[in-house]
């Protein structure tokens, strides 16, 4: 997406909650509409310890100018979200932590090597992890809903519908904002 923040979520699903989440319709977010995700997100939040992090564009652009890649940004956010959830569920220790893989394991850990606390124990990485475990599906739904809500906020602030994704329409809206409001405003959305 050209507009909007980077959102990351982590969810702890105990074995007792798996069936409940299935009954709520939690599954791979690519198989759900935005409307359905908006309806079930609060149920996930009520049922499971979670963390949702939103990195708005202004901050995203600032750290990118420092030379941080999108992979590094996502790794830092994932590590922080996992730490939040582990603190919430302590002293419980999850059997394993599954990360929907966006970078190879060694690259992920290289990105976060300078952090004070790094989640390493029982961490697994897999592509298409949403299809493997309901906790990843739940986290993806929470991250998507946080993104959608932030996009609504941006649209309200700009007094126009800000499109999602990347397309000719997105380019046209970006050009309109640049001409009307300037580069500094464009960088914040």
PLM regions with names:
Residues 1-189:
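RNase H-like, Mg2+-dependent phosphodiesterase core
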């Amino acid at each position: 997406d050209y507009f909007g923040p980077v959102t990351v979520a982590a969810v702890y699903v105990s074995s007792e909650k798996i069936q409940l989440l299935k009954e709520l319709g939690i599954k791979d977010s690519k198989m759900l509409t935005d409307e359905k995700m908006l309806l079930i997100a609060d149920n996930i939040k009520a049922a499971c310890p979670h963390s949702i992090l939103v990195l708005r564009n202004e901050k995203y652009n600032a750290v990118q100018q420092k030379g941080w890649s999108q992979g590094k940004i996502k790794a830092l956010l994932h590590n922080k979200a996992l730490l939040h959830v582990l603190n919430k569920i302590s002293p419980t220790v999850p059997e394993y932590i599954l990360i929907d893989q966006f970078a190879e394991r060694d690259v992920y850990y290289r990105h976060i090597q300078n952090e004070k606390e790094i989640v390493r124990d029982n961490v697994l990485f897999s592509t298409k992890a949403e299809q493997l475990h309901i906790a990843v599906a739940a986290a993806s739904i929470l991250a998507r809903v946080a993104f959608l809500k932030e996009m609504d906020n941006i649209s309200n602030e700009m007094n126009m519908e800000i499109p999602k994704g990347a397309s000719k329409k997105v380019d046209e809206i970006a050009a309109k904002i640049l001409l009307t409001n300037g580069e500094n405003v464009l960088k914040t959305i």
